[in-house]
From Swiss-Prot:
Regulation: Active when in complex with bcn92/Isd11/Lyrm4. L-cysteine binding kinetics are reduced in the presence of bcn92/Isd11/Lyrm4 and IscU. Activity is regulated by other components of the mitochondrial core iron-sulfur cluster (ISC) complex; Activity is reduced in the presence of IscU but enhanced when both IscU and fh/frataxin are present.
Sites where the protein binds pyridoxal 5'-phosphate: 132-133, 212, 240, 260-262, 300
Record flagged with keyword Cytoplasm: no
One biological process term in Gene Ontology: mitochondrial tRNA thio-modification
Protein name, per record: Cysteine desulfurase, mitochondrial
Chief place where the protein resides: mitochondrion
Protein encoded by which gene: Nfs1
Cofactor: pyridoxal 5'-phosphate
Enzyme Commission identifier(s): 2.8.1.7
Organism: Drosophila melanogaster (Fruit fly)
The keyword 4Fe-4S is assigned to this record: no
Length: 462
C-alpha cells in the first residue's frame, strides 16, 4: 500500500511541475503571439506530460490528443483535491449520525457552492448527477411529465446532442408533441421562428449553449429572455460551454442547465443539473430511491467525484479568461496554417458565434475516415463520440445544409487547456500532407483541377 501511495504522490508532484510549466508556456505564447520561444519549451512540456500515467507507467508513443469535445484530461489539481476522499475520508455524505458522514457532507456542499459560483446560481439549485446525459434526461423528461396534464408541447432543435433528441422521442411515444426546429446554414437558430413556435401548450424549450460538433454558440441570453416573456421554461445543455465561456443563469434567464465534469478537466461519471428555485421549476424524478438531491435524483452522491467537479469548476472560473486566450490563439493558428496551404477547406458553423476550441473543417474531395486513418498519430474525430461508431454523415452537418460528400469529409479538432503549439503545428502539417496525398489519388480532384464543374455532370447509375 505504501508503495502505491508513494507512486501516486510522485505522480502528483510530477503533474504539478508539468502544469506549472504549461502555464509558463501559455503565457509566453499568448503575449508574444509567436511560436519561436514557446515551441522549444512546449516540446519539453509534452515529453513530461506523456511520459508517465497515474500508475507510473511509461506512455510514450501515444497519439497527440486533439479531441477535447469528447473528453478532457483531468487537471492534476483536481486529482489533488479528490485524493483524500478516495482514501481517508470515505464516509457516506448522507450519514448524519457520525463524523465520517459530516466531513464528507461538508466537502460535497463545498463542491456544490463551487459549481454554483461558476454559473451564478445558488448552491441549493445544484443537483449532482452522473453526467450531462442524465442531467438532460432529468430536465427534458422531468419538466414535460410534471406539467404534462396541462401542457404537452416541447421545443428543441435538430442539432441537439443525441441524448436530448432521444429524450424528446421518448416523450413523443408518451403522446407529447415535440417540435424540432431547423437551424440556419451557420448553425444558429432563427429566433423569430422560435417565437412563432411557442404556444400556450409549450412547457419547455431545450436548446444547447455550444454545439458539440461544430462549436456554434447559440444566443442563449436572447432565448432565455424570450422564454421568460412567454412563461415557458428554458433548458440548455451547457456541457460544452460551462467553464469555457462566461455563463450567468440569472442574467440569461436560464431555468435548467446541464453540466458535465469530464468536459471541464474534471472526473468522468459526475455532472450537475441546475434547477431554478425562483420562479420554481418542478420536475418529476426519473428514478426512485432515497430522495437525495432535493428528491430529484435519488442515490448516494459520490463524494470524490463531486469534489473533483467542484475543484474543476473553481479552476475553470479562475482561469477562464486565460484559457480562452490560449485556445483562441491555437485555434486561429491551426486554421490559418491549414487554410493557407490547402484550397477547398470549409469551416462548418458560424465563424464568430462560436467556441474556438471546437473547430470543424471539411476537406473537399477527401474521405474523412481515410484522413482519420492517415492521421493515426493524432487523436481526432469526425463528430460526436456518442455516435462515432456510425458511418452515416453527421446529422448536425446535414441540418446546416452541408452536402453529403462534404459531411463525410469533416474532421473535428478539439483544442483545450493543455494543448501545445507544437501539437497544433504537427497536426496541421500532417493534415496538409495527407490531404494532398489523398487528393492526388482522387479522380474527382483531378477533374476539378482540369476546371470541370462536378455539379454539371450527369452520373450514370450502376
Amino acid at each position: 500500500m505504501q508503495k502505491v501511495l508513494g507512486r501516486i504522490q510522485a505522480q502528483v508532484l510530477r503533474s504539478r511541475a508539468t502544469n506549472a510549466l504549461a502555464n509558463v508556456v501559455r503565457h509566453e505564447a499568448t503575449s508574444s503571439r509567436t511560436a519561436a520561444k514557446p515551441a522549444a519549451t512546449s516540446k519539453e512540456f509534452r515529453e513530461r506530460q506523456v511520459r508517465f500515467n497515474i500508475k507510473n507507467e511509461q506512455t510514450e508513443g501515444r497519439p497527440l490528443y486533439l479531441d477535447a469535445q469528447a473528453t478532457t484530461p483531468m487537471d492534476p489539481r483536481v486529482l489533488d483535491a479528490m485524493l483524500p476522499y478516495l482514501t481517508n475520508f470515505y464516509g457516506n455524505p448522507h450519514s448524519r449520525t457520525h463524523a465520517y458522514g459530516w466531513e464528507t457532507e461538508s466537502a460535497v456542499e463545498k463542491a456544490r457552492e463551487q459549481v454554483a459560483t461558476l454559473i451564478g446560481a445558488d448552491p441549493k439549485e445544484i443537483i449532482f448527477t452522473s453526467g450531462a446525459t442524465e442531467s438532460n434526461n432529468i430536465a427534458v423528461k422531468g419538466v414535460a411529465r410534471f406539467y404534462g396534464t396541462k401542457k404537452r408541447h416541447v421545443i428543441t432543435t435538430q442539432t441537439e446532442h443525441k441524448c436530448v433528441l432521444d429524450s424528446c422521442r421518448a416523450l413523443e411515444n408518451e403522446g407529447f408533441k415535440v417540435t424540432y426546429l431547423p437551424v440556419l446554414a451557420n448553425g444558429l437558430i432563427d429566433l423569430q421562428q422560435l417565437e412563432e413556435t411557442i404556444t400556450s401548450e409549450t412547457s419547455l424549450v431545450s436548446i444547447m449553449t455550444v454545439n458539440n460538433e461544430i462549436g456554434v454558440r447559440q444566443p442563449v441570453d436572447e432565448i432565455g429572455k424570450l422564454c421568460r416573456s412567454r412563461r415557458v421554461f428554458f433548458h440548455t445543455d451547457a456541457a460544452q460551454a460551462v467553464g469555457k465561456v462566461p455563463l450567468d443563469v440569472n442574467a440569461m434567464n436560464i431555468d435548467l442547465m446541464s453540466i458535465s465534469g469530464h468536459k471541464i478537466y474534471g472526473p468522468k461519471g459526475v455532472g450537475a443539473l441546475y434547477v431554478r428555485r425562483r420562479p420554481r421549476v418542478r420536475l418529476e424524478p426519473i428514478q426512485s430511491g432515497g430522495g437525495q438531491e432535493r428528491g430529484l435524483r435519488s442515490g448516494t452522491v459520490p463524494a470524490p467525484l463531486a469534489v473533483g467537479l467542484g475543484a474543476a469548476a473553481e479552476l475553470s472560473l479562475r482561469e477562464m479568461d486565460y484559457d480562452k486566450k490560449w485556445v483562441d490563439f491555437l485555434s486561429n493558428r491551426l486554421l490559418d496554417r491549414i487554410s493557407s496551404a490547402l484550397p477547398h477547406v470549409i469551416r462548418n458553423g458560424d465563424a464568430k458565434a462560436t467556441y474556438n476550441g471546437c473547430l470543424n473543417l471539411s476537406f473537399a474531395y477527401v474521405e474523412g475516415e481515410s484522413l482519420l486513418m492517415a492521421l493515426k498519430d493524432v487523436a481526432l474525430s469526425s463528430g460526436s463520440a456518442c455516435t462515432s461508431a456510425s458511418l452515416e454523415p453527421s446529422y448536425v452537418l446535414r441540418a446546416i445544409g452541408t452536402d453529403e460528400d462534404l459531411a463525410h469529409s469533416s474532421i473535428r479538432f478539439g483544442i483545450g487547456r493543455f494543448t501545445t503549439v507544437e501539437e497544433v503545428d504537427y497536426t496541421a502539417d500532417k493534415c496538409i500532407k495527407h490531404v494532398e496525398r489523398l487528393r492526388e489519388m482522387s479522380p474527382l480532384w483531378e477533374m476539378v483541377q482540369e476546371g470541370i464543374d462536378l455539379k454539371t455532370i450527369q452520373w450514370s447509375q450502376h
